[in-house]
Amino acid sequence: MHQLVLLRHGESVWNKENLFTGWTDVELSPSGEEESRKAGLLLKEHGFVFDMAFTSLLKRAIKTLWIVLEQMDLMWIPERKEWRLNERHYGALQGLNKAQTAEQYGDEQVKLWRRSYKVRPPALAEGDRRHPSFDPRYHSLQGELLPSTECLQDTVERVLPFWRQQAVPALRQGKRILIAAHGNSLRGLIKYLDQVSDEDIVGLEIPTGSPLVYELDSDLKPMRHYYLETGKTG
C-alpha cells in the first residue's frame, strides 16, 4: 500500500476577507496558522510519518507545510516547491471582493467564472504588475506556461504533469508523501485519482487545514480515502 496525504493550506487573510486570491501571495490568517498546527498534531497523533513533501510557490501553502512538519518533528525531510501546485489563477478578478464582484457583474456570471469547469475569468493584461511574468519566482519559466487567467480545466491540466513526473516516481519508490497545496490544484489531483466527472469536480469542497488521506494500491489506484479528523470518506 502507498500512502498519500493531501492538505489544503490553512485559512489565508484573503480567504477571511472574501477576496479572489489565485496566485497573489498572501499570508495565513491567525486562524489558518492554528488550523495548520492542529493538522500537524492530528497527523502525529495518528502515527503518520512522511519521507518527503511537496508544496506550491505561494507562502500560504509553504507556511502550512512548515507548521505541520514542525508539529510532527519532521522539518528535516526533503520538500519540493512546485509552481504547478499553485492555486488556480483568477486573472483580473484577483484582489477583488467576491460579493462586490457579484454585484457588478451579476451572480450568474461570477458563478460561471468560479464554478464552471471551462469558463475563464477576464485575463490580466500582460502589462499588469499582477501578471506572474513580473514575479522573480517565475522567471525561469517560459512565457507560454505563465497564465494570465485559468479555468479549472486549465488548472487540472497544469497539475497532472507534476503528478506524473514528481509524485508518481516518489510513491513507486515507497515514499510516504504529503502535498500541501490549494483548493483547485488539489481538486485537479482528486479528479484524476478518483475519476471525478467535469460536472462533479466543480462542486467538490475541500476544507482548509484538514488532512485528506489516500491509501493507494500497487497501481497507485485509490483503495480508500478519508478526512483524518472524522474518518469521513472524501
From Swiss-Prot:
This protein's UniProt keywords: Gluconeogenesis, Glycolysis, Isomerase
Positions of substrate binding: 8-15, 21-22, 60, 87-90, 98, 114-115, 183-184
Enzyme class: isomerase
GO molecular function: phosphoglycerate mutase activity
Catalytic activity: (2R)-2-phosphoglycerate = (2R)-3-phosphoglycerate
Active-site residues, record numbering mapped to chain: 9 (tele-phosphohistidine intermediate), 87 (proton donor/acceptor)
Domain of life: Bacteria
Alphabetical list of Pfam families matching this protein: His_Phos_1
GO biological process: gluconeogenesis; glycolytic process
Keyword Secreted: no
Enzyme Commission number(s) from the entry: 5.4.2.11
Marked site positions, Transition state stabilizer: 182
Stored HAMAP family: PGAM_GpmA
General function of this protein: Catalyzes the interconversion of 2-phosphoglycerate and 3-phosphoglycerate.
UniProt protein name: 2,3-bisphosphoglycerate-dependent phosphoglycerate mutase
Organism: Geobacter sp. (strain M21)
Lineage start: Bacteria, Pseudomonadati, Thermodesulfobacteriota, Desulfuromonadia, Geobacterales
